Amino acid sequence: MRNSAVNCILTAVAICDIGTMASYLVYIIHFVLRRNNLCAPTFTHAWLQFLLWHVVLSITLHTTSLWLAVAMAFTRRMTLRVAALNSYWQKPRFAWKLCFIIYFTVFILCIPNMLVHEISRVQGHSWRPSKVCKTFSKNHVEPIYTFMVSRAATVNNCRLFKLNIWMIGIFFKIIPCILLIFLSFGLVIKIRDAEKHRRKLTSVPSNASNDSKLLKKKKGKPDRTTLMLVVILLVFLITEFPQGVISILCAIFTTDVHRYLYFYIGDVLDLLSLVNSSVNFVLYCVMSSRYRQTFWEVIIPSWVYSQMEKRSVLKTEESQPELKNTKHLG
């Protein structure tokens, strides 16, 4: 799976998706499913620390995944343009260097996001356990914590706060989405050109030999890798572009967007991020036979996988009588 640049970048994207989904899993279990737990406080200082790191980590990993998608589309575009075996764009070493540069750059750009918010105690409010809870004393009280905009972010007319929002909207969302649009169009054009070329190859005269027919059929296979990448890039565009627009609106109309828009659709934006992270795995399995093969080798026991391989080989031999006849004639 890792013998090409595209597969290496897909591996890096999968690492980001795993981290994003794992962080969201803990967040949903504690802050959503167990929010009404009467015997355990939800907004403690420790859990607010986790929530702060969850926000920073999810933004960092999700942005890294988006820029890796741009790198993947660019690498595939250059590979198709060069059209040479063992080109520089196809080497895993180049892909891993590119992934490391993206990881490091996004991490540096996400540093302001760590400085924007701070944990503060809610004055005048405290958490008290329910009367049915026997693990606490009768007059047990714990403080409630929440997020506040940090003092460093509010100085100089909220310069750091606005800079962070503009950076999220432009560098983390809009610019990679625009690049994905142009690269996706370029890949679609390449797919159409390859499809025209494939039709020319598969238009074999009726009096042609079996060897030439099989050769034309082999050369005329569609470029499934490029098609899979285009579908993945479209998913990124559908899920990320609306978030970029809302981030820019939030930078322009900060108070109004937070009060009247983001408060109501914040969960929808989080859902789009989760859909983007989860749908990639489905697309890999549906559109890549090599990915499916590797997935079954890892998940299924070896003796079960060997039986599946034998049945697959038998079905392939039964469905290709023409190939057998050609071999006997040779």
Q: Which stretches of residues belong to each language-model region?
A:
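Non-transmembrane, juxtamembrane loop and terminal tail segments
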Residues: 199-214, 299-330
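Seventh transmembrane helix
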Residues: 177-183, 227, 232-248, 264-318
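Extracellular TM2-ECL1-early TM3 structural module of rhodopsin-like
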Residues: 5-72, 86-87
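Helix-to-loop junction signature of class
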Residues: 19-39, 58, 62-66, 106-125, ...
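Intracellular effector-coupling site of seven-transmembrane GPCRs
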Residues: 8-16, 98-100, 132-157, 185-243
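Class A (rhodopsin-like) GPCR signature focused on the TM5-ICL3 interface and adjacent 7TM helical core
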Residues: 68-82, 112-122, 168-205, 227-250, ...
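Loop architecture of class A 7-transmembrane GPCRs
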Residues: 34-55, 60, 87-88, 108-174
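Class A GPCR helix-loop hinge within the 7TM core
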Residues: 60-100, 286-288
